[in-house]
Structures are given as structure tokens and as C-alpha cells.
Amino acid sequence: MLDKRKFYINGKWVSPSKPNDLEVINPSTEEAFATISRGSKEDTNSAVSAAKQALVTWSESSKEERVGLLEKLLDIYKKRYSEMTEAISMEMGAPMDWSRDSQTSSGQSHLEDFIVRLKEFKFDEQFSPETNNRICYEPIGVCGLITPWNW
């Protein structure tokens, strides 16, 4: 059984502030295949604090640096493709072929699309040549998202 009870916070894998394990069940076998941790308010606060600290340097990074990081992430994704396919298959109780061809491939497609769009994105736009009015896009802060359906 996989042990995935640590959180990645501030560049390190850390144990939760309080043990609160949850077994992840494969719907097709009804058997547990992994143990994860339920985060606490303290864990969330640690992650948000670390993200706020990281925002200081991230907000000053260039488009090229951000593209480089996404390309590195995409390279790691590709190297771990079969591992992710297997994890998605177990989590969803789905056939491996469908997990690989539909789910894992869509994650890769999203990263590839983000890279293309970031390369094209204008962080600073002038309204017209006659004015000095501009739109400047900057990171504004840390966001917490709760999304449905594993997305």
C-alpha cells in the first residue's frame, strides 16, 4: 500500500501537524491502495504562509523563467507518466488504457497548453500609441481553491 501522508510545503515533504489518516479506496476492487493525510487548519496555514513567502520572488520572475519552470514540470510529468496512469487508474477504479489515454494525457495537454499560452501572454499592454495608458498584469496573492471532480 502506498504511504502518501506527507505534504509538500515550502520546498520540503513534511509530516502533518496532527495525524489524521485516510485510506484511499480503489472503487473497482473496494480495497485500500494508499494512505493519505487529512490536512488540519495548522497545515493549511503553514502552506499559505510558505506560498506568501514564495510569491515575493515569484512575482518578480520573468516570463522566460516561468516558462522554464513549466517546461521542467512537463519533463517530470512525462518521466512519471506511467506512474501517474497507474495512480489515476487505482483512484478512479478505471481501466489502465482509459486512465492513460484520457486522464493522464489530459494533464500533459494542459501543461503543454499553459506553456504555449504563457509564451504568447502580454504582461504589459499599451492601450494605444497616442496614450501612455497601460494594462499591467501582476500576481496579486495566494489563492485557495476547492474544485470538484478531482480537477
State what each model feature region is:
Residues 124-151:
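Conserved small-residue-rich beta-alpha loop and adjacent elements
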Residues 1-131:
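N-terminal Rossmann-like NAD(P)+-binding subdomain of aldehyde/semialdehyde dehydrogenases
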